[in-house]
Amino acid sequence: MCKIDFLGSGVCASGLEKHYVSYYPQGRMLLYAALAEGKIPITEKCLKIADTCDLCGRCDYQCYFVTELRPTLVMKALKAEIASHLEKGGKVEKAPEDPVLREMRDIVGEDMATNDRAIAVTYSRDPGPLSVPKMPAYVVLPGTKGEISALLKLFHQRKIPWAVRGNGSQNMGFVMSEGVVIDTNRMTEIVFDEKNWAVRVGPGVAAFDLQREAVKRGYRVNVAEPAALVCANMMCSGIFSTFLTGYGTAADNCVNAEFVAADGSFFSLSDKEAPNLFAFKQADQGLPGICTSVNLKLHPMTKDEAGVLVPFDSLEKALVFSRECAVRRIGLAVGVLGAEYISTFLTPTKKLAAEIKTVFKNKLGIEYLVLIIGDQYAIQSVSAMGHPCFDQRLFRALFLGLPSLRSANWLALLDSLSSAEAFSYLKIKGFAELAETALMPSPAQLVEEIDPELRSFYEKIYARPEMTDLVWLNMFRILSSRMGREKQFSVNIIYLPLEADLIGEFCAEFKRIADRHGLKNDLGFITPIDDGKRAILEYDYFFDQNDPDEISRTQRAAMDAGALIESYSARLGTIRWIRHVVNQGFSRKENLLYT
């Protein structure tokens, strides 16, 4: 997230200039950890990486929003560590150039390929519990597809292993290599073809940046997490979001895509002689090449779009309602959200998240919320279906008044208005006004418990209209970046029929596995696909990435969950595992879901 300007506070200047992960806050933190653990010596690049940080504090705004941490503390420690080393007359290692590095530099430029371990170490790990760290021998930053082609020909000739990296959030270990890591972050071309309702995107373009440019022109694109690089995300998952209900997944998202194959040759999806990436095989597949651009579909937006949240006290009821909406094609985005997602996304601190989760479940009786995004006719249809809901006005009051949800006044108000029908208070005329009076929503109230040094900045952030707009928040998804705030998480993602009994079975089994291994766990989300015939389900296991025992238990739980998925898949023939979608994200949705 430190690579995208999602708060409007700016991005680390040295990262934008140098491009390597090491020059971003994320990389500097990984570098300091490696030095502290004695994994690498102090090198020439160490000095430059530390020196280019001016302690401006921009990363504190970004990182605290997501994780409640302040990276400048680490940046100061990094500078102090290097200064102390130099004062003691410590050696500074110079990375020697070798023939392979020389050839790479001849292709991409002197500064865009390196074997310095201060840079390599920041490409040596990902967040996943199953990943084994691998220190790459080289890191290279191509700027064009021609440079990628030349590099792959070189690696093919010299039999050098390589891996291509997006933004490093993939958690299965596929973005690491002991040979060369190819970082595509320099390739940030965005070219709109409005007459053909498409936009061509380079492999270094992040979802947030693309969505921002599309919205400026009155369009929407179906993208995933804000920091995810679009081409990599398309290749690895076919892109999934709550907008899958309206826009589809996998090949539904694109018009065309271009690739460089492992031998350095070029092909595109529209070539008749190209490899058939539209096919799907339910097994692990190798990378067909590097996606150097994708032509994504542009979707129209209307000025009357809005969002509602429909509360339910059981998963079965939430699933029945979401399927009904999908079958009737009500809404562009539909998602069943669990209490963990709801409380974590909405709250600025871990403490408030835990308290709000308890209030939602134990006081309000809300186990699940179904999100619906649509135009005025879709929202009217939801209302006509008779379910109480939080409309945009109530959502704003709830969001900015979250600390007051714990108050006796609010809970007493709900008790006085409750009836036999669950959540009936939401139907009472004038309830929005009563809620605003009881909750006293304001940006100042929402941020009252965060770090005092950052409070005024965040008060201005939460005063922006888009920060309480359900449509904007689900398009740009900056709140979902908080998912790993308390602990890192391991995801279980499957495609399956949208059947309440089957989904209930899976959730119960995923929970049983996690409980057996002593792991925090919860449902993430469920989104209908293909008119409600199928759904995508995410169930999350949480672990402390600094606790070897907890990592070990998560590894065992992940293996058990994988065995569970494969057993259901073999027995029913209708289950698809995200593991098998990796490198098959361009397959036809029909091939993915039904063949």
Sequence positions of predicted segments:
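FAD-binding core of FAD-dependent oxidoreductases
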Residues: 158-307
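Conserved phosphate/anionic-ligand binding catalytic regions in large, soluble enzymes, centered on
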Residues: 2-4, 55-66, 278-295, 530
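Glycine-rich N-terminal segment of FAD-binding domains in flavoprotein oxidoreductases
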Residues: 121, 125-187
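Conserved glycine-rich FAD pyrophosphate-binding loop
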Residues: 19-27, 160, 175-179, 183-185, ...
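Short, conserved charged micro-motifs
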Residues: 147-150, 209, 315-321, 377-385, ...
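Intrinsic disorder at enzyme termini
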Residues: 1, 5-10, 72-111, 116-121, ...
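C-terminal substrate-binding/cap subdomain adjacent to the FAD-binding core in PCMH-type
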Residues: 238-247, 254-443
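Ferredoxin-type iron-sulfur electron-transfer modules in oxidoreductases and energy-metabolism complexes
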Residues: 8, 15-61, 67-94
